[in-house]
Regions:
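Bacterial N-terminal signal peptides that target proteins for export
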Residues: 2-14
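C-terminal motif of bacterial Sec signal peptides marking the signal peptidase cleavage site
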Residues: 21-25
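Bacterial signal peptide processing site
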Residues: 27-30
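A short alpha-helix/helix-coil micro-patch that ends at or immediately precedes a cysteine
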Residues: 34-89
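Solvent-exposed, polar/charged alpha-helical surfaces in well-ordered, non-transmembrane soluble domains
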Residues: 53-61, 75-86, 104, 118, ...
Length: 180
């Protein structure tokens, strides 16, 4: 009779152990947590690159919430923004005319714009920080909400020797003629 009493306890113990092993196995099979959104990625390194598509999406959302058109990334504007960001980083200066006047740069860019505006900045280490800084600054907000803008170029440049580390340039524009 003593053996019969041990059997249910043994079976119960075995079932509890098997259940625990199964739960542990299930827990380890879970998908890894999702990656952090790219707008939180630090751009304070030489190999980091701003996610232009994410920037266009954020700016488009902001614009459409304010009754304006969305924007798309343009390669010519991106090249122009990259040159501006790199020039500011090389000189450790935050200014629109570090290369040449913005209007002169636009005319020589290959992007025939009927309207354009430029936001620059430094010290923001993520796209989220730059976007928030521009949104909270009246002149920069006005540029992000430029009526008629349909294209953007955005770029960063890393300057490890600078107190700012990351320099930004954002260009919003509308082409004079539809772009293909």
């Amino acid at each position: 009779m003593g053996d019969i009493r041990l059997a249910p306890r043994f079976v119960m113990g075995f079932l509890v152990a098997a259940t625990l092993v199964g739960l542990v196995a299930c827990a380890s099979d879970r998908d890894p947590p999702p990656a952090e959104p790219s707008f939180y990625n630090s751009l304070a390194s030489a190999e980091a690159k701003v996610d232009a598509g994410m920037a266009a999406s954020m700016i488009s959302g902001y614009r459409t919430n304010n009754g304006l058109s969305s924007v798309q990334v343009d390669p010519e504007l991106t090249k122009l923004a990259q040159a501006q960001a790199q020039a500011m980083a090389a000189r450790d200066k935050i200014e629109h005319n570090v290369l040449r006047d913005f209007n002169v740069r636009m005319r020589s860019s290959g992007f025939d714009a009927k309207l354009a505006a430029e936001n620059i900045g430094a010290g923001y280490h993520t796209l989220a920080q730059a976007f928030s800084g521009w949104r909270d600054s009246p002149p920069h907000r006005k540029n992000m909400l430029l009526p008629g803008a349909t294209h953007i170029g955005i770029a960063t440049a890393y300057a490890p020797q600078s107190k700012y580390k990351v320099f930004w340039a954002l260009i919003l524009a509308a082409p004079d003629r539809p772009r293909g």
